[in-house]
């Protein structure tokens, strides 16, 4: 999820466009460091941050950010499950926030240290079923999952998961996401079930469908389906909307669609893991990200939907009114949020994916 390739604006050109440079407005206040050393260890999706955000934060605060990358939530969870190796801030998706709360892997946030949350974030994101009261997580970005495709190489718009999961028409030209939730969840949607089904029979149906389709699938991609699409290695890929939007900037033959059977709507968050060595610095960085100008620069660069209303207001219509970034109500009506289903249900999916990959 969330893999950035090319910039649209640098921080300076973005701020110049909004008049902020001329007005002498900075990205954030200079922070007074407390007892913590001026370091922050950030565990994030692949380059899922603004082009200059880390440097800008260092200029504003004196805090040096080191960023490590993970490919999916499973990797994030596994990395921290046996103990925090030293991270201060992580970016779990909504269902994994709930999972990590139950596993006591997150610490409560001090909202008093994050004033930009109430000031700038849209009211719809100021509470969450997966984290009531936003006790453990702050909203970062949100979006959908669907099909990225090369228009000149397919016959029409691939408006059904059938194109990827139940047809040999594009054999050898299809990529699926490798995560168990993504592949099995979309197979469940295609079969008319809930993405969040915990019924072993329904999960087995999804497994059987993908195994049957496997000879026609070129690759189960580790969050790089957009790169395979851009390079011409595949013509259809299961991917996150922002990843496809990024490569659409480089090639106007590429497009994105949410299939008619529906998909998921997800929300990525900012959270502090248990035993974080620099929790105060993590709070400062969260508040910085939720600043209007900083948040706008990040959203414009990575092309995902920001929950930061103040940031969205600063961005042009080709972002703020783009239905591939901010889906229509009709599209959202066909989507459902992924929820934490319990460890037993997660094992069912993980084991099903293991059998799929081994088939």
Name each model feature, range by range.
Residues 1-9, 23:
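N-terminal secretory signal peptides
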Residues 35-99:
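Early extracytoplasmic/lumenal segment of secretory-pathway proteins
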Residues 91-216, 221-230:
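Extracytoplasmic ligand-binding site segments that recognize negatively charged/polar headgroups
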Residues 96-101, 230, 236-253:
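A ligand-binding cleft/hinge motif common to bilobed small-molecule-binding domains
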Residues 148-153, 189-190, 267-278, 286, ...:
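A bilobed periplasmic-binding-protein/Venus flytrap-type ligand-binding module shared by bacterial periplasmic
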Residues 203-212, 218, 250-274:
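Periplasmic-binding protein-like
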Residues 273-334:
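Mature extracytoplasmic/periplasmic domains
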Residues 329-359:
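Conserved C-terminal helix/tail region of periplasmic/extracytoplasmic solute-binding proteins
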């Amino acid at each position: 999820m969330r893999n950035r390739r090319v910039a649209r604006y640098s921080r300076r050109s973005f701020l110049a466009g909004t008049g902020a440079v001329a007005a002498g407005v900075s990205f954030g206040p200079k922070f007074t460091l407390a007892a913590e050393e001026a370091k922050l260890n950030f565990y994030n999706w692949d380059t899922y941050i603004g082009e200059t955000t880390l440097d800008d934060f260092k200029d504003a605060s004196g805090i040096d950010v080191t960023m490590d990358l993970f490919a999916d939530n499973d990797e994030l969870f596994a990395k921290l499950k046996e103990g925090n190796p030293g991270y201060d801030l992580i970016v779990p998706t909504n269902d994994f926030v709930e999972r990590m709360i139950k596993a006591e892997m997150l610490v409560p946030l001090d909202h008093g240290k994050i004033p930009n949350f109430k000031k700038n974030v849209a009211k719809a994101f100021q509470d969450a079923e997966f984290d009531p009261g936003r006790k453990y997580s702050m909203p970062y970005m949100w979006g959908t999952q669907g099909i990225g495709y090369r228009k000149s190489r397919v016959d029409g718009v691939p408006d059904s998961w059938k194109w990827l999961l139940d047809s040999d028409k594009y054999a050898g030209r299809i990529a699926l996401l490798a995560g168990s939730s993504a592949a099995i969840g979309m197979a469940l949607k295609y079969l008319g079930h809930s993405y969040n089904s915990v019924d072993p029979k329904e999960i087995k149906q999804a497994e059987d469908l993908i195994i049957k389709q496997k000879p026609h699938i070129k690759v189960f991609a580790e969050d790089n389906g957009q790169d395979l699409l851009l390079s011409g290695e595949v013509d259809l890929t299961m991917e996150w909307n922002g990843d496809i939007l990024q490569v659409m900037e480089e090639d106007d033959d590429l497009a994105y669609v949410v299939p008619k059977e529906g998909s998921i709507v997800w929300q990525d968050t900012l959270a502090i893991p248990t035993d974080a060595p620099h929790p105060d610095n993590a709070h400062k960085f969260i508040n910085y990200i939720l600043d209007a100008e900083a948040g706008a620069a990040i959203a414009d660069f990575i092309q995902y939907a920001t929950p930061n209303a103040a940031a969205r207001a600063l961005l042009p219509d080709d972002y703020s009114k783009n239905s591939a970034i901010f889906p229509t109500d009709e599209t959202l009506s066909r989507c459902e949020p992924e929820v934490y289903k319990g460890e037993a249900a997660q094992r069912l999916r993980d084991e099903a994916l293991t059998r799929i990959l081994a088939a």
